[in-house]
């Protein structure tokens, strides 16, 4: 089948190269569309810009998810499964293609850890770059032009037919999934599966951060999301404590307290992290702050102070033993032996011929004076500072 068709869209022309099968799919919001594509210029050579088959990885987009190149959703929803079609698109539809292409190329080269899909995250920031890092894309960005897209529709999945990633969810769906992820994280934490629990908390935080970008900072809805984010972040930090990643805990809790200095749990969690890395003064200061803000936590604070005292005593004893061992090793080390003397050359054989004129003797350097003092001892090593030791 080879027919030229005009879609009911300005600046788009469709030519079917190979007919599809079945009826037109039901492209509802949330449907996943999987396809191969080839992008070409409209010059005589039909210069290829991108081809998904070259990386052996189909493209996929989610219908209704604000894809970067909006015209592609229009093109795909006009196709049947296994159909191959060529679309000519005018400049009004192709202006952002260089930005999309840059993302796709970087992903194909392994520079992006996600799969080969693209959605509208940080699109506006992309315009701040003076160069896209590819000469052909820089040229397209400077002088937008019509492009040809050859698309083969491979598969259409309903929203219920695949596991949707959180970035694919609508705002309403993200708000609904956050408490589910939160509860699952708590369940996994109680089972001691801290790595899995931390992943659930992280996923929920990402959902909330995405929603928060759409609100005006410090207004009611933004603050509501911020409170939820802080709660999940502190749960995440408790997973990190279990995994002995103390410095990351210090980073997250300090960031929370910079913006919200009244959160008691943040001081408490940070105090525990300080104690684990022998920051005694900082741990005590945070525990004191906990008591000031929440006197009812006196019992828990006393317990942490006892643990801190025991930890510091163990550390001091460990360092005392280390220093004593170094001193004893230095005292028992034998003095260095003097260097061996070089072997003397054998006497020259007597000649029976007429005596030759003796060669001129080179001037000899004076011998080095021997030191009469005792051998030097190696310098003693400095003990590790308790505040910077990495031992746990």
From Swiss-Prot:
InterPro entries: AIP/AIPL1/TTC9 (IPR039663), PPIase_AIP (IPR056277), PPIase_dom_sf (IPR046357), TPR-like_helical_dom_sf (IPR011990), TPR_rpt (IPR019734). Residues 329-392 are annotated as: Disordered. The keyword Cytoplasm applies. Disulfide bonds: none annotated. GO terms for cellular component: cytoplasm; nucleus. It is found in: Cytoplasm; Nucleus. Residues 53-145 form the PPIase FKBP-type domain. Residues 335-346, 355-366 have a biased composition (Pro residues). It holds the Pfam family PPIase_AIP. TPR repeats lie at residues 178-211, 230-263, 264-297. Keywords: Cytoplasm, Nucleus, Repeat, TPR repeat. One of its GO terms (molecular function) is peptidyl-prolyl cis-trans isomerase activity. Interacts with NUB1. PANTHER family: ARYL HYDROCARBON RECEPTOR INTERACTING PROTEIN RELATED (PTHR11242), ARYL-HYDROCARBON-INTERACTING PROTEIN-LIKE 1 (PTHR11242:SF2). May be important in protein trafficking and/or protein folding and stabilization. This is Aryl-hydrocarbon-interacting protein-like 1. It comes from Macaca mulatta (Rhesus macaque).
């Amino acid at each position: 089948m080879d027919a030229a068709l005009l879609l009911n869209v300005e600046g788009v022309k469709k030519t079917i190269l190979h007919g599809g099968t079945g009826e037109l799919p039901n492209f509802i919001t949330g449907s996943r569309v999987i396809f191969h594509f080839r992008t070409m210029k409209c010059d005589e050579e039909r210069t290829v810009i991108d081809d998904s088959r070259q990386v052996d990885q189909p493209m996929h987009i989610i219908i209704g998810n604000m894809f970067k190149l909006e015209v592609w959703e229009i093109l795909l929803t006009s196709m049947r499964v296994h159909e191959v079609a060529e679309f000519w698109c005018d400049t009004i539809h192709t202006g952002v293609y260089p930005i999309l292409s840059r993302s796709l190329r970087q992903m194909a080269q392994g520079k992006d850890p996600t799969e080969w899909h693209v959605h509208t995250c940080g699109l506006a920031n992309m315009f701040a770059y003076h160069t896209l890092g590819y000469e052909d894309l820089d040229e397209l960005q400077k002088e937008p032009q019509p492009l040809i897209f050859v698309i083969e529709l491979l598969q259409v999945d309903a929203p219920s037919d695949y596991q949707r990633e959180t970035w694919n969810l609508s705002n309403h769906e993200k708000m609904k999934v956050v408490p589910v992820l939160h509860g699952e994280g708590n369940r996994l934490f109680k089972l001691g599966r801290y790595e899995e629990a931390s992943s659930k908390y992280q996923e929920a935080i990402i959902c909330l951060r995405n929603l928060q970008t759409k609100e005006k900072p410090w207004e009611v809805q933004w603050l509501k999301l911020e409170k939820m984010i802080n709660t999940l972040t502190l749960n995440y930090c408790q997973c990190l404590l279990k995994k002995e990643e103390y410095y990351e805990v210090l980073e997250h809790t300090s960031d929370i307290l910079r913006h919200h200095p009244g959160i008691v749990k943040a001081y408490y969690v940070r105090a525990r992290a300080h104690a684990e890395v022998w920051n005694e003064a900082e741990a005590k200061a945070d525990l004191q702050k906990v008591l000031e803000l929440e006197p009812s936590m006196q019992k828990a604070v006393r317990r942490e102070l006892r643990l801190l005292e025991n930890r510091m005593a163990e550390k001091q004893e460990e360092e005392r033993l280390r220093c004593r061992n170094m001193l004893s090793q230095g005292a028992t080390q034998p003095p260095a032996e003097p260097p061996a003397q070089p072997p003397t050359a054998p006497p020259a054989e007597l000649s029976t011929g007429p005596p030759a004129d003796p060669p001129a003797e080179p001037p000899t350097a004076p011998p080095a004076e021997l030191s009469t003092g005792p051998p030097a001892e190696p310098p003693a090593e400095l003990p590790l500072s308790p505040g910077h030791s990495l031992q746990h």
